[in-house]
Amino acid sequence: MVHIFTGILLGLLLLATGTQAQFQFFEQMFGGGQQQQHDSREQNVPSDSDWYQRTYDNARCSNYLCPGTLACVAVPHHCPCQHPAVEDKFELGDGSAICVSKGGFKFGEAARKVELARKGLL
């Protein structure tokens, strides 16, 4: 009788522990993560254009200062893309350039698609 009572008590204890672990999991997923979200918001860069304007104004460039990258180049269409790992640069015939997403295409494919679009074929 004592063994049965001990077994039942042990089973209830294990069940309660497992249930508590499940509720902690759901609490963390749906409500307990608020503290983590608060911490990540404190680390974000403030949405303030004053930093960019100060950096732009203090940049020294005797030629053309690219507004997107703050690179100093000879002419505007030589400006590099802001995200070269995921963008291809395509120089247009009028002395300007655009950066387009590579989108998983092979090298040069984005530029080919831009050219097709300019001709009205895409």
From Swiss-Prot:
Cell division among keywords: no
Swiss-Prot/TrEMBL GO biological process terms: ERAD pathway
Source taxon at top rank: Eukaryota
InterPro entries for the chain: LCL2
Signal sequence range: 1-21
Key words, A-Z: Signal
Recorded family membership: Belongs to the LCL2 family.
Functional summary from the UniProt entry: Probable component of the endoplasmic reticulum-associated degradation (ERAD) pathway.
Name by which UniProt lists this protein: Long chronological lifespan protein 2
